[in-house]
Amino acid sequence: MNKRSVIIAGIVASLLGLALGANFYFMYYLSAEEGHLASVRALENMIRHKMRHLKPNYLNRNPRFFMFRNKLLKNYKAAPYENASVLWDIANWWPHENEVYPLYDSSMGQLLETLRREPITRVSNLGRGTQLKLLVRLSHQQKVIFKPQWYPREEVIDGMIYSGKDRHTAEVYAFYLGAVLDFRWTPIVVGRVVNLKKEIYAKGDPELQQTINIETDEDGREKYCLFGKCHYCNEEETVCGDERHNIEGVLIYIVPGTLAKRRSPWQRTYKDDKRAPWEDDMTYCKSLKNKMETIRLLDLIDASIFDYLIQNGDRHHYETREERVVLIDNGKAFGNPNKDHLDILAPLYQCCLLRKSTWDRLQVFSGGVLTEIIDRLSKQDALYPLITDKHKKGVERRLLVVYAVVEHCMDIEGDKMFKTL
C-alpha cells in the first residue's frame, strides 16, 4: 500500500469514527428538538457521570454558610413568651402569598414554644383525607392539626415511593428544611408528646371518643388506642399510648387564608401496570411551558427539589395560596433511606428551569452542612432526633444529585435556565 493510500485510509477511518461517535452522542443525548435525553435511564447514566466529576465547590463547605447558620440558629432558638394570644395573631398576620412566615422574625422562637406548651382545650376528628388527623384547639381557640406516630424512626418502608402511612417527624423536618432553603411555604410544625387519655380522650368530643378503644388488662390497667376517622381509618389499625398513655405526634399550624387544591402535572397513576405520560416523555415540559405561567412552573420545580431531598413522591395534588404553591402535607417523606427516586426531580430535569435565588441558596449548603444545620435547629424539638443517620446521609447524597442535574441542564441551556421570578 503506497503512502497516498495509507493517508486516504486514515481519513476514511477518522470520518467513520467521528460518524459513529456523533451517532452514539445523539442516540445517548437524543438531542430531540431541545437536547433532552432520550430516557430516564440515559439521564441516570449522565447523572452518575456528572457526580463523578462534580466541581470541588459542591463537595466543600461554602464560606457563606456560617453567616446563614448564625442567623438561622438565632431566629429559631426557643424563647419564653407571656401572651399566647398575641403570638397567634402575629402568626396569622405573617402569611403573604405562599410565604407562610418571614425569613427572620424575633417572634418565631416564642411561637414554637407556644405550640409546644399551650394546653389542649378541645379535640375532634378531622375526617377529610386518607390519613388519621385530629383537629386540636389550644388556648384562645387557636386551631392546629395533630398527626400521630405510626412508625419508629428506624423502620424502613418498602414498596412504592408512596407506600405506608405518614411519618410524623417528616412534617417537622420539612418545616426546618423549608426554613433553611428559603422555601418558606410549609406550615409551622413542632413535635409534641401528648397524653391519649388526659389530653385527647378527655378533651375529645363524643364522635372522637367513639373512635378510641379502651381496653383493660387483668391487673386493671387501661390501654387507650385511637383509630380516628378518615378514608383509610379502621379499628384494625390503631395508635396506642404507652404505659402512661403517651403518644408522639406533631402539631401543624393551619395556614391562614384560602387554599386551592390543584392536580399536579407530574401526578402518578398509582397503578402498577400503567405509567403516566411524563414518566416516559423526556420532552413533557415543552407543552407545559406554553400552558402554565412561568412563576407557577418555577414554584413546582422548587417543590420537586424539596420533595426529592426528603423523598416525598406523593404530591399528586398541590395547594396554592394567592396563586402561589404552598407545601402542605409532607408526611410521606423518609420512607427508605437507601432509595433515591430520581423521577421526583422530573420537573427540574425535563424543564431545565430554576430560580437563580434557589440555585444560589442550594450552593450555600454544600459540603454536608444541610443536615448539620437542620440537626442543630431541631435539637430543641420534643421529638429530636427527627430522622436517623441513614436518612441524613440520604439527604446529602440527593443534594449532590440536584447539583449534577443542574449542571446537566446548564450544559443544555447555559445561564438562561436561571430565572429571577
Swiss-Prot record:
Its cofactor is Mn(2+). Residues 1-21 form the signal peptide. The active site is at 314. One of its GO terms (biological process) is proteoglycan biosynthetic process. Glycans are attached at residue 83. Keywords: ATP-binding, Disulfide bond, Endoplasmic reticulum, Glycoprotein, Golgi apparatus, Kinase, Manganese, Metal-binding, Nucleotide-binding, Signal, Transferase. It holds the Pfam family Fam20C. Mn(2+) binds at residues 166, 329. Its EC number is 2.7.1.-. GO terms for cellular component: endoplasmic reticulum; Golgi apparatus. ATP binds at residues 131, 147, 252-255, 319, 329. Kylose kinase that mediates the 2-O-phosphorylation of xylose in the glycosaminoglycan-protein linkage region of proteoglycans. This is Glycosaminoglycan xylosylkinase homolog. It comes from Drosophila melanogaster.
